[in-house]
Design a protein with these regions (language model features):
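Cofactor-binding active-site loop characterized by glycine-rich and histidine/acidic residues
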Residues: 124
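Non-catalytic terminal/interface segments that mediate subunit docking, oligomerization
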Residues: 98, 103-106, 305-352, 364-367
Length: 388
């Protein structure tokens, strides 16, 4: 499947289900809103049209549609990679709407799965007593325009932690121009010298998981784990809790708190059995039913408990509207570079140990068309930048 075309395939499946009377209209009527709007948006994507755009055969796509409609239970496991392109949000929406339209909810093993990280109902509201202050919220994906264009008021100070925006934020060139502002005071608090650290006025060393306490859940596990330090902090490195506690104290907001004290305070708000198991054994499994059936044991957390298949707000915000598709191939730049997670690093961690000459994988047909052979040095570029 060509990168960025997942939304087209999903919409073709929706059209197939509606057109062949395979949509579960009874379920949709009782448990969803906006199904008619979704159907309208999917109408343009026939099996043949979607297959041509996605680079698969019509017979392959139709066979998949038949299998999905026929099998019960049927589950969709949606990961995060599908959203990492300009059509990503619409793709995730279209894919996760399929179980509702096809009527795959209500049975064990049916529906969809993305993450079990909320299985323990573990929320910061359990230990944060003060109300959230009334402050301005800024979309982190708009960092470049925020740093350059916001003036009511403008951003004068940036504190970067747990992220590397120069490498991860959209519109990289604009982000870099913003970070180069002479009047912007930037602090980078990290474990390694990231791309963003090159633009910092001050760099503060952070501890790794080997040096600090933490509470950890995951996308797949039905458990909560406690991470304990196994070595002392190296050099001047400090954990997040202590740095922000010190900042709060200097601002007259709160008393200082160590990493261990914060852990004990947080666990004290938990039910006794969870707290005791966590502190004694280092992990605790979910005390709730870990195998819920969607639309039997659990329902959406929307105000009416229904699936919203067409959000008017998202439709207004999306550049091409909800379920819209943008052709990612341009005349001058017909290929798409995918940058998935690496088996050599964890985000920026260990990045300093990776050899600079990274391998590029290409489809043999694309490589042949460009005269590229194995072990050749290549230049990957578009109108915004390049990597060699």
């Amino acid at each position: 499947v060509k990168p960025g075309t997942d939304v087209v395939l999903a919409l073709a499946l929706h059209r197939y289900l509606f057109a062949n009377n395979l949509a579960d209209t009874k379920f949709l009527s009782a448990n969803s809103r906006g199904a008619d709007r979704l159907q309208t948006r999917a109408e343009q994507w026939t099996i043949d049209q979607a297959a041509k755009v996605a680079g698969v055969t019509s017979s392959q796509l139709e066979k998949f549609a038949e299998l999905y409609a026929d099998r019960n239970p049927a589950v969709i496991r949606c990961g995060w990679g599908v959203e990492r392109n300009r059509n990503g949000g619409n793709a995730a929406m279209a894919i996760l709407a399929l179980p509702a339209v096809a009527g795959k909810f209500g049975v064990r093993g049916g529906g969809y799965s993305m993450s079990n990280s909320a299985a323990l109902k573990f929320s910061p509201s359990m230990w944060l007593q003060a109300k959230e202050p009334s402050t301005r919220l800024i979309n982190m994906n708009h960092l470049g325009r925020v740093l350059l264009d916001y003036n009511d008021p403008g951003i004068e100070m940036l504190f970067v932690y747990n992220c590397n925006p120069v490498a991860t934020m959209p519109d990289q060139n604009r982000v870099i121009r913003g970070l180069r502002r002479e009047d912007l005071f930037t602090v980078v608090f990290d474990q390694v010298a990231t791309d963003t650290a090159a633009f910092a006025d001050i760099i503060l060393p952070a501890t790794t998981f080997l040096e600090s306490y933490d509470l950890v859940n995951s996308y797949g596990e039905m458990s909560l784990q406690m991470s304990r330090p196994v070595i002392d902090s190296v050099g001047d490195a400090r954990p997040n809790v202590e740095v922000f506690s010190e900042l709060a104290s200097r601002l007259g907001l709160d008393e200082t708190e160590t990493d261990a004290e914060a852990l004990l305070r947080v666990t004290s708000t938990m039910p006794d059995d969870i707290r005791d198991n966590l502190l004694e054994h280092g992990s605790v499994s979910s005390s709730i039913n870990a195998r819920p059936v969607q639309f039997v044991d659990v329902k959406p957390r929307t105000p009416d408990g229904k699936i919203n298949l067409f959000s008017e707000q998202l439709d207004a915000e999306a550049p091409r509207g909800l379920y819209g598709y943008q052709d990612l191939s341009e005349n001058n730049f017909p290929l798409t570079l995918i940058s998935p997670a690496s088996n050599s690093t964890i985000c920026s961690i260990l990045g300093e140990l990776v050899e600079r000459a990274a391998p590029l994988e290409m489809h043999p047909d694309d490589a042949k068309a460009r005269g590229i052979q194995k072990d050749d040095a290549v230049r990957v570029f578009n109108g915004l930048g390049e990597v060699q």
